[in-house]
Amino acid sequence: MKYINVRGCNGSGKTTLLRCLARDPLCRVINVIVPDHKPIPVTYAPDGIAIIGDYTPAAAGATTAGLDRIKTQAAAKAVAELVGRDPDVKAVLFEGVVVSTIYGPWQEWSKANGGMIWAFLDTPLEVCLKRIQERNGGKPIKEDQVADKHRTIARVRDKALADGETVRDIHWETALKDIKAVIENLG
């Protein structure tokens, strides 16, 4: 099992967490080509970690880094599979708020690809709302929509657990330490 899907609602810290894994100056970004999609950047860290999207410090100003910038689930799955076939890659990480709310198709994909770790950030809703507010300069946000996503993702976590999927909870205050432990414990 080498796939790790970091899940959480808007403002939970998904992108920030993966950016922390890509701070090494030796990280490189390679554009990967999959059918019916423009090139998709993948960040390769020297320790065998690949992250779908450009998470390097140079891309920190980008609004969307992960799967949310990929137009279709088919393309997202194709790039993850392609990167996962690289024998030098020990872990493929990906995140996105849209994928965080979807269960069935990703569970099927997980089963077809040797399993996936469902890594859920447990960031409290109030913290998510505060972060979103700060990031968009204090403009009003639709708090009810964020709360709905927060609840939906909690239900997805419960469903994954009930179905016997490999679920890991990532504590929002120790997220980097927690995700590194998940990576370290890959089979």
UniProtKB/Swiss-Prot annotation:
It catalyses: 5-hydroxymethyl-dUMP in DNA + ATP = 5-phosphomethyl-dUMP in DNA + ADP + H(+). The keyword Kinase applies. SUPFAM superfamilies: P-loop containing nucleoside triphosphate hydrolases. One of its GO terms (molecular function) is kinase activity. InterPro entries: HMUDK/HMUD1, P-loop_NTPase. Keywords: Host-virus interaction, Inhibition of host innate immune response by virus, Kinase, Restriction-modification system evasion by virus, Transferase, Viral immunoevasion. Pfam families: HMUDK_HMUD1 (PF18748). One of its GO terms (biological process) is symbiont-mediated suppression of host innate immune response. Belongs to the thymidylate kinase family. 5-hmdU DNA kinase subfamily. Phosphorylates 5-hydroxymethyluracil (5hmdU) into 5-phosphomethyl-2'-deoxyuridine (5-PmdU) on DNA as a step in the pathway leading to thymidine hypermodifications in the viral genome. The phosphate is added internally to the DNA polymer. Also transfers glutamate to 5-pyrophosphoryloxymethyldeoxyuridine (5-PPmdU) to produce 5-Nalpha-glyutamylthymidine (Nalpha-GluT). As a final result of the pathway of hypermodification, 5-aminoethyl-2'-deoxyuridine (5-NedU) substitutes for about 30% of thymidines in the viral DNA. This is 5-hmdU DNA kinase. It comes from Pseudomonas phage M6.
